[in-house]
Amino acid sequence: RLFALGAVPRSTSTAFEWMMRQRGDLDCLHEPFGEAWYQGEDPLWPRYREGGTTTPGLSIESVWQDIRSRAAERPVFLKDFPHYINHIWTPEFLSHFTHAFLIRDPAKTITSMYDKWPDFDELEVGFPEQRALFDLLTALNGTPPPVIDSDDQLAAPTEMVEAFCKAVGIPFIESALTWEAGGDPSAHSWWAGGSLHA
């Protein structure tokens, strides 16, 4: 099975991903499509300039092949941003995933983005694409996918994670909500110096 959390930058999504890693029963992927969007052989991000970092052989298509191969071995959870792949949203592609969304107040998200990348482009913010994907999935499936509000998640983590697990059809593992200090989320990130997407 493939579980996809559609988020936006600076939405506490990496913390949610870290919690999902603690479960131990999922192959967790950190923004796999984002790596191709930013650093693939044909980067799609709007601030890319000739001579910037690229990775030969890395593309949205190669990432998708890798995800499917992993999912054939064990369940996969990925946290990613819908604006990285809005050009490949087809009913067939989207049908491979059990979808959920993590939202956060834009005032908090965008000010946090500005703090980390003062030169960010509006196409990197991702709110229009996140909403568009939610609406598309609702239309395709006849029912809206689960949505977690970051503020609710921070205020009542046990209740929110339990509800999330029930909604996507996985066991609730309460022990995943706590972990030893000192873990390094950047070890799972392709971004130089680790992820800035808290």
Stretches with model-predicted labels:
Residues R1-A71, L177-A198:
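PAPS-dependent sulfotransferase catalytic core
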Residues Q65-I88:
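Glycine-rich phosphate-binding loop used to anchor ATP phosphates in small-molecule kinases
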Residues F3, D27-L29, T98-F101, P146-I148:
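Hydrophobic/aromatic beta-strand patches that form the interior of the parallel beta-sheet core
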Residues L2-A4, R74-F77, P144-P145:
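Residue-level preference for the first positions of well-ordered beta-strands
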Residues P9-S11, F33-A36, P82-I85, P106-T109, ...:
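Short, solvent-exposed loop/turn segments at secondary-structure junctions
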Residues L94-M113:
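Conserved phosphate-donor/acceptor-positioning beta-strand/loop module used by diverse small-molecule
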Residues K108-L177:
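PAPS-dependent sulfotransferase catalytic domain
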